[in-house]
Amino acid sequence: EIFLYREQHMGLFFRKNTNICDINKLNFKLFDKNIYTLFQENIRKLNNLLHDYNNIAIYGSGAHGNTIITFIDNSEKIKKCFDLDIRKQGMYLQNSSIIIQEPNIENFKDLEAIIIAAPLYEEEIIRSLREKGYKGDIIATEKELKII
């Protein structure tokens, strides 16, 4: 069973089946060309959105945040990462020199855009960024790539 939150994948749970199944009758889909194409289109769109920015941050140091930097054409434009988890603050995104910081007005200085890399919490993050005084562009990623 798959349980969704805001149409996002939250987890995959398996239920033990006491009936013996024939492995040859199970219908697995290992690769979907359409998903690959859509992914590539979104990477192109993200790079187009980021083209004119020079000082960018990523909000979210989990799997999305660590992965997104590998797909950005000019990753040197990513100056910092934000995360509320104090255990991560002061650390770095994997294989990078991008430091993870507390999201506050002091750390927002000189930033032109923040990419939300925590889609399940996007609405709360956007609201929090604005409440904390961030005035630059926010790039939303939950349902579609767009500048807010």
List PLM regions with ranges.
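Hydrophobic, well-ordered beta-alpha structural blocks that scaffold small-molecule cofactor pockets
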Residues: 2-148
